[in-house]
Swiss-Prot record:
The enzyme's E.C. designation: 5.3.4.1
GO MF annotations, alphabetized: calcium ion binding; isomerase activity
Record topological domains on the Cytoplasmic side: 374
Natural source organism: Xenopus tropicalis (Western clawed frog)
Residue ranges occupied by any EGF-like domain in the UniProt entry: 139-179, 291-332
Protein name: Protein disulfide isomerase CRELD1
InterPro entries: DUF3456, ECM_structural_protein, EGF-like_Ca-bd_dom, EGF-like_dom, EGF-type_Asp/Asn_hydroxyl_site, EGF_Ca-bd_CS, Furin_repeat, Growth_fac_rcpt_cys_sf
Length: 410
């Protein structure tokens, strides 16, 4: 391969790597895994196509043809066609961008570089390292290549050309090489190569054994006393940070802020008996804040025609009477046709009718009284008759209902 061709492949491979790394969702260590999967599938394809289409007959002829087929372009194409699933974007992209490398290995490098994974993924594309190594220079992971992180954690970037090499210790382990017990765990057994860590009592952050009296340090919210961790009552020491309409509820090692009862304005605990003050719509009955029944009042709360009051917790609501429904803000009979043409006085309520009646009679009587005062006997007689008629109307059953409706209001 000429110098210019090698340079082209190097630049082309670098551009491909940058393109793949820039794709959202692709992590650097994942590229090594993609390369490893590709190599695994290629090797499976090589195994599957070994001796393909040769099943007996002229042995000399078969040996000649087989030796040609073994490293033929036909066989390489058959292997490559099955190397990636159609839905595996990363694998197909890697294969597409590295066909030149695959051909170079297939035709020229196989015998001297039989390990395709090492040649392609480690040495050529520089995506992977041997197990127990990490980073651009394939440095040894903490704890050694044989047992990275002492077997109690995961070396960051292990087996790839990426990562920091820092040990991510498993639960219960800690330290730079995961050979210490984490906070909340104690050393149960240890030798030169193995460590067993077990959990402390739940209140201990550091301990020498599993018992509640073997604590060395306590978790937040607990106080160490004679080897035991005692719960701190944040509610009793006023260390809580609850809002004005919440109360403090102590828990093991902490506390909770819980909502006051809806009948309360400020409280010292749960329920209507722990209120500091009663909320609007409630009254204090002994020690409890109870709901005020606004509907049980001499003054009607619902002033609309055919409305009735329904008490609710801390308030009330106005609903239409039976066989009535609210239409256009008013309680109408269920048979009411909202599309029917309305008359001039259809929207006048009973209370408004009473007021109009009073105004009409008032004007008439005032006019008659003025004329009667001038000594006109005819108008005097009419005035007396009008007063008598008006009195008779108000004494009638209809007048009583109208007056009662007016006095009670809407």
């Amino acid at each position: 391969m000429g110098m210019s061709r090698r340079m082209f492949l190097t630049v082309y491979g670098s551009l491909w790597l940058l393109l793949l790394l820039s794709r959202p969702g692709v992590s650097k260590p994942q590229l090594c895994q993609t390369c490893q999967n590709l190599v695994t599938n290629v090797l499976k394809g090589i195994e599957k196509t070994a001796g393909l289409n040769f099943g007996g007959g002229n042995t000399a002829w078969e040996e000649e043809k087989l030796s040609k087929y073994e490293i033929s372009e036909t066989r390489l194409l058959e292997v490559i066609e099955t190397a990636c699933d159609k839905s595996d974007f990363d694998c197909n992209k890697m294969l597409e961008q590295n066909e030149e490398h695959m051909e170079s290995w297939w035709f020229k490098k196989q015998k001297e570089q039989p390990d395709l994974f090492q040649w392609l993924c480690m040495d050529t594309l520089r995506l992977c390292c041997p197990k127990g190594r990490f980073g651009a220079d394939c440095l040894s992971c903490p704890g050694g290549t044989e047992k990275p992180c002492s077997g109690n954690g995961q070396c960051n970037g292990d087996g790839t050309r990426f990562g920091t090499g820092v040990c991510d210790c498993y639960t219960s382990y800690g330290g730079p090489v995961c050979m210490d017990c984490a906070l909340g765990y104690y050393e149960q057994a240890r030798n030169e190569s193995h460590l067993v860590c077990s959990e402390c009592y739940r209140a201990c952050s550091k301990c020498i054994g599993p018992g509640d009296d073997q604590c060395v340090l306590c978790k937040r919210g607990w106080l160490l006393h004679d080897g035991k961790c005692i719960d701190i009552d944040e509610c009793g020491t006023e260390k809580d940070h609850c809002k004005s309409n919440q109360f403090c509820f102590n828990t093991d090692g902490s506390y909770e802020c819980r909502e006051c009862d809806k009948s309360c304005i400020g409280c010292m605990g749960g329920g209507p008996a722990r209120c500091k003050k009663c909320n609007k719509g409630y009254y204090r009955d002994g020690v409890k804040c109870l709901d005020v029944d606004e509907c049980d009042s001499e003054l009607p709360k619902c002033k609309g025609s055919h409305e009735e009051c329904v008490n609710t917790e801390g308030s009330f609501t106005c609903v239409c009477e039976k066989d009535y429904s609210r239409i256009d803000g008013m309680c109408r009979p269920d048979s009411y046709d909202s599309n029917a043409e309305k008359g001039l006085f259809d929207d006048i309520t009973d209370d408004e009718v009473v007021v109009l009646q009073q105004m009409f009679f008032g004007v008439v009587i005032c006019a008659l009284a003025t004329l009667a005062a001038k000594g006109d006997m005819v108008f005097t007689a009419i005035f007396i008759g009008a007063v008598a008629a008006m009195a008779g109307y108000w004494l009638s059953e209809k007048g009583d209902r109208a007056l009662d409706s007016f006095m009670k209001g809407r």
